[in-house]
Amino acid sequence: MAPSRKFFVGGNWKMNGRKKNLGELITTLNAAKVPADTEVVCAPPTAYIDFARQKLDAKIAVAAQNCYKVTNGAFTGEISPGMIKDCGATWVVLGHSERRHVFGESDELIGQKVAHALAEGLGVIACIGEKLDEREAGITEKVVFEQTKVIADNVKDWSKVVLAYEPVWAIGTGKTATPQQAQEVHEKLRGWLKSNVSDAVAQSTRIIYGGSVTGATCKELASQPDVDGFLVGGASLKPEFVDIINAKQ
């Protein structure tokens, strides 16, 4: 990892937890040592964004897990970037594979959400990744480049964007991409940014890995030159999340 890219660890709590056990988790995180050169962000369920922001130390930022592409309106069940900011959160996760594949969000919609969230001043954790059949068909690059292009077309300022590579076959399955597999895709993504955006953006943009990251797998993954951090699912609800935060130490 280049010295200019601050290590980034995001915890995606998904649709898990209640105030009692999330409060206990927050107590653990507040007591944890967060290295000065590591940025930590937690994404609680929407109902608990306010709760998490009030309870978490300032050293840990808060993200929403999703948002819509407009400011206000008749969009039952949706939240806007302005609402997210009003609750004290500063980031949003967009394009997660569960949004794409469970809820049918298109590349186009994700791109529109990215544009609106950035325009409203949120940082964006933009997720991309291939399914198992796509990897086995040898089209990983094609899939992730297409997804990245739609995101890139909607980004003016890359300083507020973290790109999260999450191979869909490794999310919640216990299968982790090997450090070499992760590095290979991250390196190609950085190459794509260099060719299609700019060398400066390629060098400065953090590309993080997601997909069954645990306390046991994080150190070797973190040692790869183009792996700039993690987006963590299940393990972010456990005390081992502290080990992942300290993966570079």
From Swiss-Prot:
It holds the Pfam family TIM. GO terms for biological process: gluconeogenesis; glyceraldehyde-3-phosphate biosynthetic process; glycerol catabolic process; glycolytic process; methylglyoxal biosynthetic process. The modification N6-succinyllysine is found at residues 149, 156, 194. The active site is at residues 96, 166. The modification N6-acetyllysine is found at residues 14, 156, 194, 238. Keywords: Acetylation, Cytoplasm, Gluconeogenesis, Glycolysis, Isomerase, Isopeptide bond, Lyase, Methylation, Nitration, Phosphoprotein, Ubl conjugation. Pathway: Carbohydrate degradation; glycolysis; D-glyceraldehyde 3-phosphate from glycerone phosphate: step 1/1; Carbohydrate biosynthesis; gluconeogenesis. The modification 3'-nitrotyrosine is found at residues 68, 209. This is Triosephosphate isomerase. It comes from Canis lupus familiaris.
